[in-house]
Every structure is written in structure tokens, then in C-alpha cells.
Amino acid sequence: MADRRRRRRRAFQDSEEEEDEESGSESAGSGGQPAAPSRQESREPGTKRAEPPREGKESECESEDGIEGDAVLSDYESAESEEEEAHLSEEEPLKTTLKQENNVEEAPATREQKPKSKGAVTGERQSGDGQESTEPEENKTSKKSQKQLDDDEDRKNPAYIPRKGLFFEHDLRGHVNDEEVRPKGRHPRKLWKDEGRWEHDRFREDEQAPKSREELISIYGYDIRSSKNSEEIRPRRPRKPRFGSPTRREEISEKPSRPSNRYQDSGISQPLRPYTNRNAPPSNKVGPSRTYSRQGGYKENRSSYQSEEEAPPHPSERRQDYGGHRARSTEQGPAPPREFSPEADPIIKEEPVIEKQAAEPSPPPPDRPVEKKSYSRVRRSRIKVGDTGKSMEDTTVTELPPPPPVPPAVAAEFTPAPLNVKQGNWEPPSEGGMSGIEEELSQMNLSEQSWNPGQPAYISPRGIPNPMHMGGGPPQYNRMEGMAVQGGRVKRYSTQRQRPVPDPAAMHISLMESHYYDPLQFQGPIYAHGDSPSSMPPQGMIVQPEMHLSHPGIHPHQPPATISTPNLYPAPVSLPPGQPPPQQLLPPPYFTAPPNVMNFGNPTYPYPPGALPPPPAHLYPNAQAQSQVYGGVTYYNPVQQQVQPKPSPPRRTSQPVTIKPPPPEENRHVKMKEKSNS
């Protein structure tokens, strides 16, 4: 590149010298110029020979001087300009040799011209003397000034913008129209055709008509407009029960072969469902259990089903749907007491009718779950004492093993009346009003005002047959938790918290026999009647072995049985009030004085080691009620005691979080200063 520039500079200087000589000869003004034609002829062919290559290759970038010399290629040139360079490099030696010849010829011509120029007439010009240029001298100089370039076109200027080559085809600086910049013949190729671009989405008139049934079946596989298979097409209720209960799966699998609901209305026994995990639901209980699965599912609001079920299913069934099939097993429990009492058979048949009577003064047990609104509350309140009583009343008869054989000594003391009375009343009678269980429980009211969840479960809920009544068998449930958990539900910590008990009339006391007396479960003080009865919760109670204590409320016509082992009751040992009882002894339970004396105080009679405490009385805080003492146990008549149900505390109103506006700016700055100072 440097050699090429040097050569061009030399050629440029030579051409300048030629012009100077021409102007000098012209100013001499010689009239006859014999040598001029020859010199001009010799020069003209040279210029003519040298000019064609110049014209053929116009300069790529014009220099400041305006001379159309060969372009000095910039470093930014692309492959196109490199091809042009090859041509230029071939033509350059030719140009230089021609210019040198011209210089050699011009030198003698000028020498000859000088002496002869004196005789030439000024202002007269010879034709063909080589001076007849079409433009006057002024125009030549003005042409130089016209070629004055802008800063961005001048290569010597730092603001020069190279515009040649592929790299600069989009450089639009200083250009008004694109045609100058865009290289010709370079059009962007189309990558796709736009002709049929929107054919798939075009509006076609012939497609707007409704399709025929065959077309619908070919497209969708079935006729989406037909109302015959409306079971598959009708929109489902979006709200499904949580934890997809097995009832949902049964419903889907049994749909084709499911019999209609007329069994429920007519009372005809329907074939049993083939499930093994149920408690063998009898024929007449299938009706209610089927209505709940409809109720819990998504078909509740359809008119076709409303005609079949005139009465809506009971809320207890809706609750059970969320709990799954485990809750249903407790409802179906009452059915099989046929093994126990054949006379209960007609009573059960009308039980679905009883369930639907909502306006009874004292509703039967299945009506109580009306208050359960949500699944989580069902889970929590399932362990409540009243609820365990209800569910246990349904299940225990079927699940309890038959009582073990009674020893003859005990059998002699037992009268068959309690057994029959208890068994006949397991099922509520078909008539409205109070059932047998409710009447029995109203006599055996247990106050639950100071109920402690940590107590051992020696107080069984209602409906559980007393082991004392059933004959000397072991207690069927050792723990209240065992009864509550029997539904297959995991016992949670939240179920052990103290909650308001719904109905205080739901409990009576199951008096355990001391064969199964566990001293570890009698650690706390036993409830005693005193001035502040609610201060000590009931801890449990025991009955001495082989003795039958008849409750005056249940069997008022029986004489009290004799105590067969009176030597277990030791004489009371009196201690000074300040002296603590011996360490190994139990805390002092309620000890009654001799049978004809009432003892309402807080006694401090510890027992000597090895002695068992006598059973305390029924746990009633009302000490003024009439009471009877049988065999060292004080019984109170519950009918004369008004037990006030403990009102549940009102729900705490959720108060919104108050959002205070930020303090004003000046106070904030003051506080910041105080903090920084401190």
C-alpha cells in the first residue's frame, strides 16, 4: 500500500508540472509555433493513451484536491474493492511509464518553444495548437473549489465515514434516500410464500351451517348435541368432596348397574352392597346410606333426581360423606341387634322415618349432627364426649363380645331385670318423643361442668352397657380414647383440648369392677363434695368386686344388694389436719360415713396401706339434693337436680390489623436524631 501511494504522488507531481509548463508557454504568446503541433501531437496521444484507464476506473473516494486519481482504498474495503485493486495494480506500471515518456518529450519542446515564442503575436491563437480547451482558466480553478468535500467524505478528516462494502450498507448517516446506500441487485430473499398463508383460518361461508350428526360423530366420536346420553354431557358440579371418598369411586363404577331409589320409598329390602369393610349394613339401612352418597356428590340439584328423593337426605349423611366410609360404619352400626333381641326387629324398620323428623321435641341421636358445618369441625368434634356417646350407642351392641359366664356366687345376686331393661332400650322406639335411652339418661344426669380431658375413661358415655349389668365381664373399653378412635381416625393433639360439651345429659357412670383396678389411673384426687365442687375434676371410680349396686334411679323397685365383702372397708383412721397422708397412699377420695349418715364435707381420711378406697358417689356439685346411701355409696336423685348446661364461650371476633400512617416528616427527623444521640 505504501509503494502504491508513493507512485501516485509522483504521478500527481508530474501532472502538476505539465500544467505549469503549459500555462508558461501560453503566457509567452509566440505567434508561430512550428514545434507546438508536434509537441501537442506527441502529448495528445500520450494523454489519450493514459486517460482510458483513468476513465475506466473512476476513483472510489475523491481526494481533497479534486483530482480524479486512482482511489486510495481504505482498510474498510470489502471483497468487491479488493477485486478492483487487482485491476489497478496491473494498470499502475503502464501509467507511470507513459507519464515518464511524456516528460522526456516535453523537455526539448519547451526549450525550442522559448526562443520562438518572442515572434508570436499576442492574443492570436493557432488552430490545433493544443490550447483550445473548452473551459477557460477560471473554470478550471473553480472546478477545484467545487470539489471541496464534506468532513465525512474526506478521507484525511477523522470524521470520514466509509460507505463502501457490505459492512456499511446499512449505515444511513448523512443520506436522505436509500438508493445511494443500498447496493443494487441485492434484494432480501423471501423465506416463505405469503400466498396461502391464512388459508387455515379463513372465513368460509359453506362451513357456517350446522353439521350433520355423521359429521359430529366423525369429528368428536359421539354426537355432542344429543340429549340421550346426558349423563356424560351435563356439566358436573365443580365442588367435589375433599380427599376423594370411596363413595365417589363406587358411584362411577356402579353407575350402569345401580338400581333406582324406589327401594327406599317402598321399604323393600334391597340386595346388599358387596363391600367387606362395612359393618354388614342390613337391607333396610341401605336406603339412607344411599341417599347420602347422592347428597355428597354432584347430582344434588338435578330435577331428575329430585323426583325420586322427595325428602332431602339428612345432614348427618352429608357430614359423613366428607369423612369417608369410616363415619358411615358408625351410623350403620345399630342394625344387627337382631342377635340380641328379636323384638327390636319391627322397631328398626321405621328408623329412617325417625331420622327425617326434624321437629321432634327431643330429637333422636342421628339428628344431632346438624350443627356440624364443615369437615374440619367434624374431625375435631368427633372426640367430644357427647358425640362419642352417640356413636358408641350405635356401635357397641354389635361390637361387644357376649358377656363371659358369670360365677355362680355373683349370678345369685344378679337379677335378670337390668339385663332386659337395658337390652330392650338399645334401639329408640318408633314413636316420637323421648326414647328409652333418653328417659334413662335423664335420670342419670352427669354434670360435665368441670370435665377434664385428662381423666381416665372410667366414665363411659351413654348407651354402653355397664359391665356390672352385663355380668362379671371385663370392661369393654379401658380408655375414652379407645372409644373415640375406634372409627379408624387418628387421634390428634387438638382433640385433647378442653371444649364446650354440647349436651350435658349424655353421660352416666359405668361402675368398673376392682378386678381391673389400675392404681396408675387414680393418681389425682377423687372428686369430693365440698364448698367449691368444681375445683377438683372427677378422676374415676371403682366398685368393689362381686357386689351389685343397684341404682335407685334405674331400678327403684329393687332392694339394695348386700355387700358380699364388707371386710374390705377398713375403719377410718383419723389424722390431725396438718399432718400429710403417707406417701404410698392414694390421695384421699370421698369416703362416706356409716350408711345412715350423710357426709358432705371434704374428708381427710387416708387409708392404711393395702386398702382400697370405697367408690365415691355420682359426681354432682349440687349437695343440697336429696340423696340415698347404699352400702357406703351416696346416690343422689338426678331428677331433682337442675343441671345448667354450660354455655359455650362466644367466638372471638377477628379484628383487622390497624395500619397506622407513617409519622410526619419533622417528627421522624426528631426521632432519628434522638436515636443517634442515644
From Swiss-Prot:
Domain of life: Eukaryota
InterPro entries with a match to the protein in the record: Btz_dom, CASC3
One CC-aspect GO term: exon-exon junction complex
Biased composition (Polar residues): 124-133, 258-269
BP GO annotations: mRNA splicing, via spliceosome; mRNA transport; nuclear-transcribed mRNA catabolic process, nonsense-mediated decay; regulation of translation
Pfam families per the UniProt record, alphabetical: Btz
RNA-binding found in the keyword field: yes
Compositional bias segments (type: Acidic residues): 14-24
Record field: compositional bias (Low complexity): 25-38
Protein name per Swiss-Prot or TrEMBL: Protein CASC3
Originating organism: Xenopus tropicalis
